[in-house]
Structure formats: structure tokens, C-alpha cells
């Protein structure tokens, strides 16, 4: 090493300390991850608290417990959706019919059940109207479709649809002039 490097302060300090003594100082200052402490405070090692934890997949157990507490006199109902859209038509129709019947039943003063059929007929009437409207719309579409395909416009007719300052007579006169000019060019 050079003399300038050896004359620096940190090099002089390193010379004066014994290597064993330096290792001891380093080992005292090493902090392990196992135990941290604050100066001036007594460390109390926390005792491990044990917890009894039960794990269940899903919320089914929680829902059942809450239902038993709040609705103990009601029968167990099936949770979840049994049908969606057109997946299970029979089950969906049964549920709708059961709801309609329960709405239509009224208890008379004597305790006998009276069913109101006016709502059922109203429902059937609405369904028939909807079916007839769909049938009419499909017939109209069938009638309109051939008419569109039967008549095709010519290119000359389309050019007259374009808005212009010239009348149709003037446009015909122009066409004849153009045709004459073309014939002259062909002759030359």
C-alpha cells in the first residue's frame, strides 16, 4: 500500500485495533431476526396464544346456522337457483304456477278457500295477444321481402335522383352531345 493511504485516519485506526478485538465488537452489534429489544425496557416474551379455528369451504355452514336461528319454525328450503332461462322449463313453470295459485287463493270468513280465476284468464289472454302479434309481424316481413327484390333500378334512374341544378331534359341533351363527341373521336 502507498504511504498516503496508510497515513489516512481510518487506516491508522485499523492498525491500532487488534483483529480479535474487532471481531468481538462486530459480533456484539449484530442483531438477529429472532429477538429485538428496546434499550431501557424489559422485554416480555409474548406467550403464544392458541386459537381454535375451523375452516369450511364456502358459506354454506354459515348460512345454515343463521337460518336455523331466525327461521326455526319454517321448513328447510333448497338454496340456490334450480333453473335459469330455458335450462329447466318444467321446474320454472311449476314454480310460477305455485306462486300464482298462492296469490289467487283467498280465505273466506268461514275458513274455506276461494280461488280467483280472473287473473289466470288475464294471463292466458295476454299470452294469446303476444303470439298473434308475433305471427302478424312475421307475415308482414314475408310480404315485404319479395317486393324489394322484384324491382331493380337502372343506373340512369339513379343518376336522376341526384340533386342537380339541371332539369331532366337538359341532362338528356347533354347525353346526346356526349354521344356525338364520342362518335367524332372514333372516326378520327
UniProtKB/Swiss-Prot annotation:
The keyword Nucleus applies. One of its GO terms (biological process) is nuclear mRNA surveillance. GO terms for cellular component: nuclear exosome (RNase complex); nucleolus; nucleus. Residues 120-149 have a biased composition (Basic and acidic residues). InterPro entries: MPP6. The keyword Nucleus applies. It is found in: Nucleus. The modification Phosphoserine is found at residue 167. Residues 174-188 have a biased composition (Basic residues). Pfam families: MPP6. It comes from the Eukaryota. Keywords: Nucleus, Phosphoprotein. Residues 93-188 are annotated as: Disordered. Associates with the RNA exosome complex. RNA-binding protein that associates with the RNA exosome complex. Belongs to the MPP6 family. This is M-phase phosphoprotein 6 homolog. The lineage of its organism: Eukaryota, Fungi, Dikarya, Ascomycota, Taphrinomycotina.
Amino acid at each position: 500500500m502507498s504511504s498516503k493511504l496508510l497515513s489516512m485516519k481510518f487506516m491508522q485506526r485499523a492498525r491500532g485495533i487488534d483483529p480479535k478485538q474487532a471481531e468481538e465488537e462486530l459480533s456484539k452489534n449484530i442483531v438477529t431476526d429472532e429477538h429485538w429489544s428496546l434499550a431501557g425496557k424489559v422485554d416480555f416474551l409474548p406467550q403464544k396464544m392458541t386459537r381454535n379455528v375451523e375452516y369450511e369451504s364456502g358459506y354454506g355452514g354459515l348460512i345454515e346456522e343463521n337460518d336455523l336461528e331466525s327461521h326455526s319454525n319454517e321448513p328447510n328450503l333448497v338454496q340456490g337457483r334450480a333453473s335459469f332461462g330455458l335450462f329447466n322449463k318444467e321446474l320454472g313453470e311449476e314454480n310460477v304456477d305455485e306462486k300464482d295459485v298462492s296469490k289467487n287463493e283467498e280465505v273466506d270468513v268461514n275458513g274455506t278457500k276461494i280461488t280467483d280465476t280472473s287473473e289466470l284468464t288475464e294471463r292466458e289472454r295476454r299470452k294469446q295477444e303476444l303470439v298473434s302479434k308475433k305471427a302478424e309481424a312475421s307475415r308482414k316481413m314475408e310480404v315485404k321481402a319479395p317486393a324489394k327484390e322484384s324491382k331493380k333500378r337502372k343506373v340512369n334512374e339513379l343518376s336522376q335522383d341526384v340533386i342537380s341544378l339541371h332539369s331532366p331534359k337538359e341532362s338528356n341533351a347533354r347525353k346526346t352531345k356526349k354521344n356525338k363527341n364520342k362518335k367524332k373521336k372514333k372516326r378520327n
